[in-house]
């Protein structure tokens, strides 16, 4: 038994080990050249093994069928590579229609004649001529006739007959035309026109800058907002924020200009809703007290409201140049020319400045000394009729600018409990400006058009009533100044 099994066993040559046959469903299929090489190697191995075998092995060799060639096994199962674009061949519908029209003697066919040519000459459509199976390809033919520009439609001379389809003598496009997009918000003609106009307008309004304009020595052309000059103030805007906001507004006129250029008060209230603006003249660039260069434009009352302590606060936010220079500025000097100071609509501008240096006392008033007397609390320059009765004060407050000691100060007429503070001599007032806070720096430099500012900023409201004709307490004998002007502004 063992001898029989040993006789049926075939010694395997180590150089030609059995190779596994690839599965028929293997993907990707082996390349033909590789399959041929494997077949040749396998056939040579089998023949060489058969020659080396003995008679017994030659007899048993047919029992083990040789591995079939890979090409014979895989060839029938492999799909032939086809370059056919459609089921009927490589020609498209447009190509078939072109051949049908060219085959006609007069180079023109009706739609039904094109259908007949398809069924007659294209094998794929021979069994699809009935109405049930022809709906799809006939619809495709109609679409191609209308889609391509190489086909033109010519009206038939006979009545009630379909039109002729001919080839475009000018050629026309052979490919598909780009599909039109539906009109939407982004590609509508009206939207594109508006967008183009807006971009052109923005380019025209944008100031042309050269690369050298970015240096500090070359300021950018165009109006510079007043807020940009006082970048450290609370109400100022950063340059980039202003540019973005001005760009959003359309880049028009400057919003913070002179008071006469403002056409309405809404823009003014939007920028500084709680405080008016002070517009000193450009002549205030040089301070007579310090003898040095000061900013060309004094801060607005929106920036001075907090630092001067209009509501009882200190003077920590005052510009350092003014505070430092003021300490060395006081002392005997000639009396400068008095200038008017415009008070805020709600408060006296410099009323609470005495609290800036509370530790330094002031000497009693003497005519040569430059010290000032100030009010302990800000006093309303204008009082609405309803507010006057509620506060227990006299009807609308009265104010007048009069000359006084060197560097004259604007004092409000004090109604009610504050009358004694201004009626008596200034030396008797309990609160005074500290000696180190010299206001001579403002003397002669606060030139402004009072009437223009009053008309633009204060007279727009019908509830305001200004009357500067009322009698003021006589000034103390030590004060040498002009009498109060008898002039009234009544809103019309």
Curated annotation (Swiss-Prot):
Gene3D superfamilies: 6.10.250.1690, Winged helix-like DNA-binding domain superfamily/Winged helix DNA-binding domain. The keyword Transcription regulation applies. GO terms for biological process: memory; positive regulation of dendritic spine development; regulation of transcription by RNA polymerase II. GO terms for molecular function: DNA-binding transcription factor activity, RNA polymerase II-specific; RNA polymerase II cis-regulatory region sequence-specific DNA binding. Residues 225-235 have a biased composition (Low complexity). This is Forkhead box protein O6. PROSITE patterns: FORK_HEAD_2 (PS00658), FORK_HEAD_3 (PS50039). Transcriptional activator. It is found in: Cytoplasm; Nucleus. GO terms for cellular component: chromatin; cytoplasm; nucleoplasm; nucleus. The keyword Lyase does not apply. Residues 192-203 have a biased composition (Basic residues). Residues 88-182 bind DNA. Residues 472-486 have a biased composition (Pro residues). The modification Phosphoserine is found at residue 184. Residues 1-76, 163-235, 315-338, 466-492 are annotated as: Disordered. It comes from the Eukaryota. Keywords: Activator, Cytoplasm, DNA-binding, Nucleus, Phosphoprotein, Transcription, Transcription regulation. Phosphorylation of Ser-184 is be important in regulating the transacriptional activity.
């Amino acid at each position: 038994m063992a001898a029989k099994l040993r006789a049926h066993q075939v010694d395997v040559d180590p150089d030609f080990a059995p190779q596994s046959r690839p599965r028929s469903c293997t993907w990707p299929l082996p390349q033909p050249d590789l399959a041929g090489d494997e077949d040749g190697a396998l056939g040579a191995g089998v023949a060489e093994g058969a020659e080396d075998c003995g008679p017994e092995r030659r007899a048993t060799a047919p029992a083990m069928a040789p591995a079939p060639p890979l090409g014979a096994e895989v060839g029938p199962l492999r799909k032939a590579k086809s370059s056919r674009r459609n089921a009927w061949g490589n020609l498209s519908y447009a190509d078939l229609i072109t051949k049908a029209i060219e085959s006609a003697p007069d180079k023109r066919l009706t739609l039904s004649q094109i259908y007949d040519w398809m069924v007659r000459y294209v094998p794929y459509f021979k069994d699809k001529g009935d109405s049930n199976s022809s709906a799809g390809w006939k619809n495709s033919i109609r679409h191609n006739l209308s889609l391509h520009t190489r086909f033109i439609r010519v009206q038939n001379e006979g009545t009630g007959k379909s039109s002729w389809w001919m080839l475009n003598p000018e050629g026309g496009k052979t490919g598909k035309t780009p599909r039109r997009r539906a009109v939407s918000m982004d590609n509508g003609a009206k939207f594109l026109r508006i967008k183009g106009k807006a971009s052109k307008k923005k380019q025209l309004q944008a100031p042309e800058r050269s690369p050298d304009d970015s240096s500090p020595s070359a300021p950018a052309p165009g109006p510079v907002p007043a807020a940009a000059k006082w970048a450290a103030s609370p109400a100022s805007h950063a340059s980039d924020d202003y540019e973005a906001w001005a760009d959003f507004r359309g880049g028009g006129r400057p919003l913070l200009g002179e008071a006469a250029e403002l056409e309405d008060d809404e823009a003014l209230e939007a920028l500084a809703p709680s405080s008016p603006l002070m517009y000193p003249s450009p002549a205030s660039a040089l301070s007579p007290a310090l003898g040095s260069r000061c900013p060309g434009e004094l801060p607005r009352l929106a920036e001075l409201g907090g630092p001067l302590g209009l509501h009882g606060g200190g003077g920590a936010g005052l510009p350092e140049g003014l505070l430092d220079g003021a300490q060395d500025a006081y002392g005997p000097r000639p009396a400068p020319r008095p200038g008017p100071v415009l008070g805020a609509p709600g408060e006296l501008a410099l009323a609470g400045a005495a609290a800036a240096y509370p530790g330094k006392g002031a000497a009693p008033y003497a005519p040569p000394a430059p010290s000032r007397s100030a009010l302990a609390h800000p006093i309303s320059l204008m009082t609405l009729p309803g507010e006057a009765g509620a506060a227990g004060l006299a009807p609308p407050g009265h104010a007048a600018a009069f000359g006084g000691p060197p560097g004259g100060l604007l004092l409000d007429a004090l109604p009610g409990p504050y009358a004694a503070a201004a009626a008596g001599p200034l030396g008797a007032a309990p609160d005074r400006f500290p000696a180190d806070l010299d206001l001579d720096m403002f003397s002669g430099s606060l030139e402004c058009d009072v009437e223009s500012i009053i008309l633009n900023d204060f007279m727009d409201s019908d509830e305001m009533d200004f009357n500067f004709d009322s009698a003021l307490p006589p000034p103390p004998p030590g004060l040498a100044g002009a009498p109060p002007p008898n002039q009234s502004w009544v809103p019309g």
